[in-house]
Design a protein with these regions (language model features):
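C-terminal target-recognition/interaction regions appended to catalytic cores
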Residues: 3-153
Length: 153
């Protein structure tokens, strides 16, 4: 996920590249969460733990692992579900989230920050849909094309 977000660097004035103002408590909590881990880490001090009973969603305050593919980009959810940078104590910007979804940097999302977040998270990644449509068109035209055999038994 690191290469996807950092290569090439996103321009400072890029569209949809607005940083979220994190509360001091969120910043302090993020300092205890390692890349690839989430808010349920046992290392987090008691005063920074989430006071949630029952469900423990795996993506709450989850940091990206810079050396692995991203986890699912979501379009909604409460606090702590915005996807978090592996090193910096902050949520990803919508432009960074759009890159994870394979949108080109010149693709402009219209609307407020949460509306744009939803558009990105609810979208089918452009590169993914391209593969699907190419396979569909080749199948409909009875063309041979490269494929991978299913491993379902």
């Amino acid at each position: 996920s690191r290469d996807c977000i950092t290569k090439p660097p996103i321009k400072k004035n890029a569209d949809n590249h607005i940083y979220t103002n994190q509360s001091q408590k969120v910043i302090e909590r993020l300092k205890w969460i390692k890349p690839g881990e989430n808010a349920w880490s046992e290392d987090i001090p008691a005063n920074l733990r989430l006071n949630v009973k029952g469900a423990k969603l795996s993506n709450i305050y989850k940091r990206l692992n810079p050396d692995k593919p991203s986890y699912t980009v979501t379009g909604s959810g409460g606090g702590g579900t915005h996807m978090y940078h592996w090193k910096e104590n902050r949520a990803l910007t919508n432009r960074e989230r759009a890159r994870l979804q394979t949108f080109p940097d010149d693709f402009l999302f219209i609307g407020g920050k949460e509306s744009v977040r939803k558009q990105i998270g609810m979208a089918v990644p452009p590169k993914g849909i391209k593969v699907i449509f190419q396979a569909l068109l080749n199948s409909l035209a009875s063309n041979d094309y490269e494929s991978i055999k299913p491993n379902i038994k």
